[in-house]
């Protein structure tokens, strides 16, 4: 998966970036990209790019920039927008490549440059100060890139890069809002509570096999839902046109196209909201699943308790059957020799330590091949689902017995 390569092994980071990307789509396709209190209007559509660069790095910031650019290009493709806005659309301007660079290319470069800048200072002892400075500079960089490209590609509009060096009270207010959002996101992400949630989600007990299966099904469902949503948008556009015509309003091809354009814009906003909600539900599910998993662990030894172990044995057997291994593997029982004598002669504290060490050695030796659990008292079991031959198993067990003898001695 592309997301896994970009964000490493953290499921939590992938979910957070997915939500941030959906927020970018939402505000790029709606009025939410602007905070408007007449006569003040502040754009915040670029802020998810800066937050992505701050939290996740260069590649996620570039992807977010592309999403911003595509949203800008789509909105500029309607026939009712202002002439200056039309140059952001390859379909409305006379220079399609220039418009593509102006709308998508400049926002992609913004993500690249801001991502590289945050990556360069991430390990700095004064990162918070750099965060504030880069947040402000990112705003000016966005203005510089967009108006600089406009000055070169569309000079007839009289706008150029010098606008980036002009400051008024709106620019100062935008900088304050940007610092507040970026710094707030950074502090929230690195707070103790959120980091604990991240740890739980990343360690959740959903196996990669099950997770991949669910992801493939989810992608298939999403593709079907997206197709049906677009069909529904086209249908409602047609019905809207019919209703207006019945009222005596003449609808030409441009108006019909704009109605469909607005319907699809609405669809994108709804999809973005649903993605955010879905990812939040997944995060809550995996967090609670891991809390339940911890509750089923053996508190003394740190390995699975009896109930959880037997449940996982059944799940793993079913998985092996699905993978075509016909449930083959090894099921091993272990107990501590003369454990009652250890407790009687040395006390329960020593006995507990022996159990902890015993379970630790079992887990260390066998967890790469299967799962380990405590059945009760001094009895343990392991289910090995890797296809080991008898000789390989004997070699592993010989080394394990040698380590276990060291504990008991």
Feature roles, as predicted:
Residues 2-27, 74, 78-151, 182-187:
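Short helix-perturbing small/polar motifs within transmembrane alpha-helices
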């Amino acid at each position: 998966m592309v997301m896994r390569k970009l964000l490493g092994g953290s499921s939590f980071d992938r979910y957070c970036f997915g939500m941030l990307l959906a927020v970018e789509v939402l505000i790029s396709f709606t009025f939410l990209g602007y905070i408007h209190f007449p006569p003040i209007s502040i754009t915040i559509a670029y802020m998810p790019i800066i937050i992505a660069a701050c939290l996740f790095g260069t590649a996620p910031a570039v992807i977010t920039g592309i999403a911003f650019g595509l949203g800008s290009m789509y909105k500029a493709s309607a026939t009712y927008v202002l002439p200056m806005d039309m140059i952001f659309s390859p379909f409305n301007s006379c220079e399609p490549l220039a418009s593509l660079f102006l709308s998508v290319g400049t926002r992609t470069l913004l993500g690249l440059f801001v991502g590289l800048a945050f990556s360069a200072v991430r390990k700095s002892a004064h990162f918070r100060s750099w965060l504030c400075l880069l947040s402000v500079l990112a705003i000016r960089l966005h203005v510089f890139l967009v108006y600089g490209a406009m000055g070169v590609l569309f000079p007839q509009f009289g706008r150029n890069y010098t606008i980036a060096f002009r400051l008024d009270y709106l620019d100062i207010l935008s900088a304050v809002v940007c610092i507040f959002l970026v710094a707030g996101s950074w502090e929230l992400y690195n707070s103790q509570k959120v980091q604990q949630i991240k740890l739980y989600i990343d360690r959740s007990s959903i196996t990669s096999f099950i997770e991949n299966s669910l992801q493939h099904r989810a992608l298939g469902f999403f593709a079907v839902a997206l197709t049906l949503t677009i069909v529904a948008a086209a249908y409602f556009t047609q019905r809207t046109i019919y209703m207006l015509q019945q009222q005596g309003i003449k609808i030409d091809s441009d108006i019909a196209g704009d109605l469909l354009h607005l319907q699809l814009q609405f669809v994108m906003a709804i999809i973005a909201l649903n993605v955010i909600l879905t990812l939040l539900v997944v995060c809550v599910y995996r967090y609670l699943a891991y809390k339940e998993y911890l509750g089923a662990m053996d508190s003394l030894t740190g390995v699975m308790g009896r109930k959880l172990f037997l449940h996982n044995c059944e799940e793993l057997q079913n998985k092996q059957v699905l993978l075509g291994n016909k449930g083959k593997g090894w099921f091993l029982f272990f107990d501590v020799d003369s454990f009652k004598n250890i407790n009687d002669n040395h006390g329960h504290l020593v006995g507990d330590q022996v159990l902890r060490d015993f379970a630790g050695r079992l887990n260390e030796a066998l967890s790469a091949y299967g799962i380990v659990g405590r059945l009760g008292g001094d009895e343990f079991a392991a289910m090995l689902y890797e296809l080991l031959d008898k000789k390989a198993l004997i070699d592993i067990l010989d080394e394990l017995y040698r380590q276990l003898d060291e504990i008991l001695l």
